[in-house]
A protein has these predicted regions:
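Membrane-interface interhelical linkers
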Residues: 1-12, 16-36, 40-71, 81-91, ...
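Hydrophobic core positions of alpha-helical segments in small-molecule transporters
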Residues: 13, 40-41, 72, 99-102, ...
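Hydrophobic/small/kink-forming positions within alpha-helical transmembrane segments
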Residues: 19, 50, 74-78, 104-109, ...
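Hydrophobic/aromatic residues within transmembrane alpha-helices
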Residues: 28, 37, 41, 87, ...
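Alpha-helical transmembrane segments of compact multi-pass small-molecule transporters, enriched
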Residues: 44-48, 99-113, 128, 190-195, ...
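Loop-to-transmembrane alpha-helix entry segments
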Residues: 63-67, 100, 111-136, 140, ...
Length: 294
Protein backbone atom coordinates (compact mmCIF):
# COMPACT_ATOMS: atom_id res chain seq x y z
CA UNK A 1 0.00 0.00 0.00
CA UNK A 2 1.57 3.30 -1.12
CA UNK A 3 2.17 6.25 1.20
CA UNK A 4 -0.09 8.34 -1.06
CA UNK A 5 -3.00 5.93 -0.66
CA UNK A 6 -2.46 5.73 3.10
CA UNK A 7 -2.49 9.52 3.19
CA UNK A 8 -5.84 9.54 1.38
CA UNK A 9 -7.28 7.04 3.86
CA UNK A 10 -5.95 9.15 6.74
CA UNK A 11 -7.62 12.28 5.36
CA UNK A 12 -10.96 10.50 4.93
CA UNK A 13 -10.66 8.98 8.40
CA UNK A 14 -9.98 12.42 9.83
CA UNK A 15 -13.04 13.83 8.06
CA UNK A 16 -15.24 11.10 9.52
CA UNK A 17 -13.78 11.68 12.98
CA UNK A 18 -14.42 15.42 12.81
CA UNK A 19 -18.01 14.78 11.77
CA UNK A 20 -18.57 12.59 14.83
CA UNK A 21 -16.60 14.95 17.07
CA UNK A 22 -18.58 17.98 15.90
CA UNK A 23 -21.85 16.30 16.81
CA UNK A 24 -20.49 15.15 20.17
CA UNK A 25 -19.38 18.68 21.00
CA UNK A 26 -22.67 20.07 19.69
CA UNK A 27 -24.50 17.97 22.25
CA UNK A 28 -22.51 19.36 25.18
CA UNK A 29 -21.55 22.79 23.85
CA UNK A 30 -24.24 24.69 25.75
CA UNK A 31 -22.50 23.80 29.03
CA UNK A 32 -19.17 25.38 28.06
CA UNK A 33 -18.02 28.68 26.62
CA UNK A 34 -16.05 28.45 23.36
CA UNK A 35 -12.82 29.31 25.20
CA UNK A 36 -13.52 26.68 27.86
CA UNK A 37 -14.13 23.99 25.24
CA UNK A 38 -10.88 24.83 23.45
CA UNK A 39 -8.92 24.84 26.72
CA UNK A 40 -10.29 21.56 28.06
CA UNK A 41 -10.07 19.82 24.68
CA UNK A 42 -6.42 20.81 24.39
CA UNK A 43 -5.64 19.76 27.97
CA UNK A 44 -7.23 16.33 27.66
CA UNK A 45 -5.76 15.81 24.21
CA UNK A 46 -2.29 16.58 25.54
CA UNK A 47 -2.66 14.05 28.35
CA UNK A 48 -3.78 11.36 25.90
CA UNK A 49 -0.97 12.06 23.44
CA UNK A 50 1.61 12.22 26.23
CA UNK A 51 0.59 8.72 27.27
CA UNK A 52 0.92 7.38 23.72
CA UNK A 53 4.27 9.09 23.10
CA UNK A 54 5.53 7.90 26.47
CA UNK A 55 5.00 4.34 25.28
CA UNK A 56 6.07 4.82 21.65
CA UNK A 57 9.10 7.00 22.33
CA UNK A 58 9.99 10.59 21.46
CA UNK A 59 12.52 11.81 18.90
CA UNK A 60 14.33 15.15 19.49
CA UNK A 61 12.82 18.03 17.49
CA UNK A 62 14.98 20.75 15.94
CA UNK A 63 14.25 24.41 16.61
CA UNK A 64 13.20 25.17 13.00
CA UNK A 65 10.15 22.88 12.84
CA UNK A 66 9.39 23.59 16.51
CA UNK A 67 8.88 27.29 15.79
CA UNK A 68 6.57 26.62 12.85
CA UNK A 69 4.53 24.06 14.78
CA UNK A 70 4.24 26.49 17.71
CA UNK A 71 2.81 29.18 15.43
CA UNK A 72 0.54 26.63 13.76
CA UNK A 73 -0.78 25.49 17.13
CA UNK A 74 -1.58 29.00 18.32
CA UNK A 75 -3.27 29.96 15.06
CA UNK A 76 -5.19 26.75 14.49
CA UNK A 77 -6.08 25.80 18.07
CA UNK A 78 -6.06 28.92 20.25
CA UNK A 79 -7.79 30.99 17.58
CA UNK A 80 -9.25 28.56 15.03
CA UNK A 81 -10.88 26.18 17.50
CA UNK A 82 -12.25 29.01 19.65
CA UNK A 83 -13.88 30.58 16.58
CA UNK A 84 -15.18 27.15 15.55
CA UNK A 85 -16.85 26.48 18.90
CA UNK A 86 -18.32 30.00 18.90
CA UNK A 87 -19.85 29.26 15.48
CA UNK A 88 -21.01 25.82 16.62
CA UNK A 89 -23.12 27.39 19.37
CA UNK A 90 -24.88 29.64 16.85
CA UNK A 91 -25.32 27.45 13.75
CA UNK A 92 -26.90 24.04 13.09
CA UNK A 93 -24.22 21.35 12.90
CA UNK A 94 -24.88 20.47 9.25
CA UNK A 95 -24.69 24.13 8.19
CA UNK A 96 -21.41 24.69 10.01
CA UNK A 97 -19.63 21.69 8.52
CA UNK A 98 -20.70 22.75 5.03
CA UNK A 99 -19.29 26.21 5.73
CA UNK A 100 -16.06 24.42 6.61
CA UNK A 101 -15.92 23.35 2.94
CA UNK A 102 -14.44 26.79 2.32
CA UNK A 103 -11.31 25.63 4.14
CA UNK A 104 -9.80 23.65 1.22
CA UNK A 105 -10.38 26.59 -1.11
CA UNK A 106 -8.70 29.08 1.21
CA UNK A 107 -5.93 26.59 1.94
CA UNK A 108 -5.36 25.90 -1.75
CA UNK A 109 -5.01 29.62 -2.46
CA UNK A 110 -2.54 29.93 0.41
CA UNK A 111 -0.64 26.89 -0.86
CA UNK A 112 -0.52 28.55 -4.28
CA UNK A 113 1.01 31.68 -2.80
CA UNK A 114 3.28 30.29 -0.09
CA UNK A 115 4.11 26.67 -0.98
CA UNK A 116 4.33 26.94 -4.75
CA UNK A 117 1.61 24.36 -5.43
CA UNK A 118 0.08 24.80 -8.90
CA UNK A 119 -3.32 23.17 -9.56
CA UNK A 120 -4.31 22.47 -13.14
CA UNK A 121 -7.29 24.14 -14.85
CA UNK A 122 -9.49 21.27 -13.66
CA UNK A 123 -8.45 22.22 -10.15
CA UNK A 124 -9.84 25.71 -10.58
CA UNK A 125 -13.09 24.16 -11.80
CA UNK A 126 -13.18 22.27 -8.52
CA UNK A 127 -12.71 25.51 -6.60
CA UNK A 128 -15.66 27.03 -8.44
CA UNK A 129 -17.87 24.05 -7.62
CA UNK A 130 -16.94 24.20 -3.93
CA UNK A 131 -17.70 27.93 -3.74
CA UNK A 132 -20.91 27.46 -5.71
CA UNK A 133 -22.08 24.64 -3.49
CA UNK A 134 -21.39 26.57 -0.31
CA UNK A 135 -23.14 29.65 -1.72
CA UNK A 136 -26.17 27.55 -2.63
CA UNK A 137 -26.27 26.12 0.87
CA UNK A 138 -26.60 29.62 2.33
CA UNK A 139 -29.07 30.85 -0.29
CA UNK A 140 -32.04 30.53 2.05
CA UNK A 141 -33.14 33.76 3.67
CA UNK A 142 -32.26 33.97 7.35
CA UNK A 143 -35.36 34.75 9.36
CA UNK A 144 -35.26 37.66 11.80
CA UNK A 145 -36.09 35.55 14.83
CA UNK A 146 -33.96 34.58 17.81
CA UNK A 147 -32.25 31.76 15.92
CA UNK A 148 -31.68 34.00 12.92
CA UNK A 149 -30.14 36.69 15.11
CA UNK A 150 -27.53 34.20 16.20
CA UNK A 151 -26.68 33.05 12.68
CA UNK A 152 -25.05 36.30 11.56
CA UNK A 153 -22.35 36.14 14.24
CA UNK A 154 -22.23 32.38 13.71
CA UNK A 155 -21.29 32.84 10.05
CA UNK A 156 -18.65 35.41 11.00
CA UNK A 157 -17.06 33.09 13.56
CA UNK A 158 -17.19 30.25 11.03
CA UNK A 159 -15.33 32.28 8.41
CA UNK A 160 -12.72 33.39 10.95
CA UNK A 161 -12.26 29.74 11.93
CA UNK A 162 -11.70 28.77 8.29
CA UNK A 163 -9.07 31.49 7.82
CA UNK A 164 -7.22 30.62 11.02
CA UNK A 165 -7.25 26.88 10.36
CA UNK A 166 -6.18 27.28 6.73
CA UNK A 167 -3.23 29.41 7.77
CA UNK A 168 -2.26 26.92 10.45
CA UNK A 169 -2.25 24.07 7.90
CA UNK A 170 0.16 25.90 5.60
CA UNK A 171 2.47 26.58 8.53
CA UNK A 172 2.17 23.00 9.80
CA UNK A 173 3.19 21.63 6.39
CA UNK A 174 6.52 23.43 6.74
CA UNK A 175 7.05 22.19 10.29
CA UNK A 176 6.12 18.59 9.44
CA UNK A 177 9.11 18.00 7.18
CA UNK A 178 11.29 16.42 9.89
CA UNK A 179 8.73 15.56 12.59
CA UNK A 180 6.35 12.60 12.91
CA UNK A 181 2.63 13.31 12.71
CA UNK A 182 2.09 12.15 16.30
CA UNK A 183 4.82 14.41 17.70
CA UNK A 184 3.60 17.30 15.56
CA UNK A 185 0.08 16.82 16.92
CA UNK A 186 1.42 16.92 20.48
CA UNK A 187 3.50 20.04 19.80
CA UNK A 188 0.65 21.91 18.10
CA UNK A 189 -1.69 21.07 20.97
CA UNK A 190 0.97 22.10 23.50
CA UNK A 191 1.36 25.57 22.09
CA UNK A 192 -2.35 25.94 21.46
CA UNK A 193 -2.98 24.96 25.07
CA UNK A 194 -0.32 27.40 26.27
CA UNK A 195 -2.10 30.23 24.48
CA UNK A 196 -5.41 29.29 26.06
CA UNK A 197 -3.78 28.96 29.50
CA UNK A 198 -2.47 32.52 29.27
CA UNK A 199 -5.93 33.77 28.31
CA UNK A 200 -7.53 31.87 31.19
CA UNK A 201 -5.03 33.20 33.72
CA UNK A 202 -5.32 36.79 32.52
CA UNK A 203 -9.12 36.64 32.64
CA UNK A 204 -9.10 34.58 35.86
CA UNK A 205 -11.60 32.14 34.33
CA UNK A 206 -9.86 28.78 34.64
CA UNK A 207 -12.07 27.67 37.53
CA UNK A 208 -15.19 28.72 35.63
CA UNK A 209 -14.00 26.89 32.51
CA UNK A 210 -13.44 23.64 34.42
CA UNK A 211 -16.60 23.81 36.56
CA UNK A 212 -18.93 21.89 34.18
CA UNK A 213 -16.58 18.88 34.33
CA UNK A 214 -17.79 18.25 37.88
CA UNK A 215 -20.79 16.56 36.25
CA UNK A 216 -19.70 12.94 35.80
CA UNK A 217 -21.88 12.26 32.75
CA UNK A 218 -20.72 15.41 31.00
CA UNK A 219 -17.10 14.67 31.85
CA UNK A 220 -17.16 11.26 30.17
CA UNK A 221 -18.98 12.56 27.09
CA UNK A 222 -16.41 15.32 26.72
CA UNK A 223 -13.57 12.80 27.08
CA UNK A 224 -15.10 10.62 24.36
CA UNK A 225 -15.31 13.61 22.02
CA UNK A 226 -11.70 14.55 22.76
CA UNK A 227 -10.48 11.01 22.04
CA UNK A 228 -12.25 11.06 18.67
CA UNK A 229 -10.94 14.46 17.56
CA UNK A 230 -7.42 14.06 18.97
CA UNK A 231 -6.52 10.75 17.36
CA UNK A 232 -9.03 10.76 14.51
CA UNK A 233 -9.27 14.46 13.74
CA UNK A 234 -5.92 16.03 14.61
CA UNK A 235 -3.45 13.17 14.23
CA UNK A 236 -4.88 11.68 11.02
CA UNK A 237 -5.18 15.13 9.45
CA UNK A 238 -1.51 15.92 10.13
CA UNK A 239 -0.51 12.49 8.83
CA UNK A 240 -2.42 13.23 5.61
CA UNK A 241 -0.89 16.70 5.32
CA UNK A 242 2.58 15.19 5.75
CA UNK A 243 2.01 12.56 3.04
CA UNK A 244 -0.04 14.55 0.50
CA UNK A 245 -0.03 17.97 -1.11
CA UNK A 246 -1.84 20.42 1.15
CA UNK A 247 -4.51 21.11 -1.48
CA UNK A 248 -5.34 17.40 -1.82
CA UNK A 249 -5.25 16.66 1.91
CA UNK A 250 -7.48 19.55 2.92
CA UNK A 251 -9.94 18.90 0.14
CA UNK A 252 -10.37 15.32 1.32
CA UNK A 253 -10.84 16.62 4.86
CA UNK A 254 -13.78 18.61 3.46
CA UNK A 255 -15.71 15.36 2.91
CA UNK A 256 -16.85 15.71 6.52
CA UNK A 257 -20.43 16.64 5.43
CA UNK A 258 -20.82 13.20 3.84
CA UNK A 259 -20.77 11.83 7.37
CA UNK A 260 -22.18 14.84 9.23
CA UNK A 261 -25.43 15.35 7.34
CA UNK A 262 -26.95 11.91 8.03
CA UNK A 263 -25.54 11.91 11.57
CA UNK A 264 -27.16 15.29 12.28
CA UNK A 265 -30.53 13.93 11.16
CA UNK A 266 -30.27 10.73 13.20
CA UNK A 267 -28.45 12.03 16.26
CA UNK A 268 -29.54 15.66 16.75
CA UNK A 269 -32.89 15.44 14.92
CA UNK A 270 -31.87 18.37 12.72
CA UNK A 271 -33.48 18.66 9.30
CA UNK A 272 -31.20 19.93 6.53
CA UNK A 273 -33.17 21.35 3.62
CA UNK A 274 -33.08 20.07 0.07
CA UNK A 275 -31.08 23.17 -0.86
CA UNK A 276 -28.45 22.33 1.77
CA UNK A 277 -28.21 18.76 0.53
CA UNK A 278 -27.86 19.82 -3.12
CA UNK A 279 -25.31 22.47 -2.15
CA UNK A 280 -23.31 19.90 -0.21
CA UNK A 281 -23.39 17.53 -3.17
CA UNK A 282 -22.12 20.18 -5.58
CA UNK A 283 -19.41 21.26 -3.16
CA UNK A 284 -18.29 17.68 -2.63
CA UNK A 285 -18.08 17.16 -6.39
CA UNK A 286 -15.72 20.12 -6.47
CA UNK A 287 -13.81 18.70 -3.52
CA UNK A 288 -13.42 15.41 -5.38
CA UNK A 289 -12.07 17.18 -8.45
CA UNK A 290 -9.54 19.05 -6.33
CA UNK A 291 -8.52 15.89 -4.52
CA UNK A 292 -7.84 13.69 -7.52
CA UNK A 293 -6.95 16.20 -10.22
CA UNK A 294 -5.55 19.20 -8.32
Amino acid sequence: MSAHFIGILAALGSAASWAVGTLLFKGIGEEFSPLAMTFIKSLLGLLLLAGVLGLAGWEPVKSFPLGWLALSGFLGISLGDSFFFAALRRLPAHRLVILMLLAPVVTLLMALCFLGERPAIIGWIGIGLVLGGVSLTFKEKIQADEAGDRRGPGLLFGVLSVLAMAGSVIIAKIGLQDVSAMEATFLRLSFGFAGMLVVGLVRAELGHWLAPLRQAGLRWRFLLAVIVVTFGGFWLSLYAIKRLDVSIANTLLATEPVFALPLAVIWLKEHPTATSIVGAGIALCGAGILAFNG
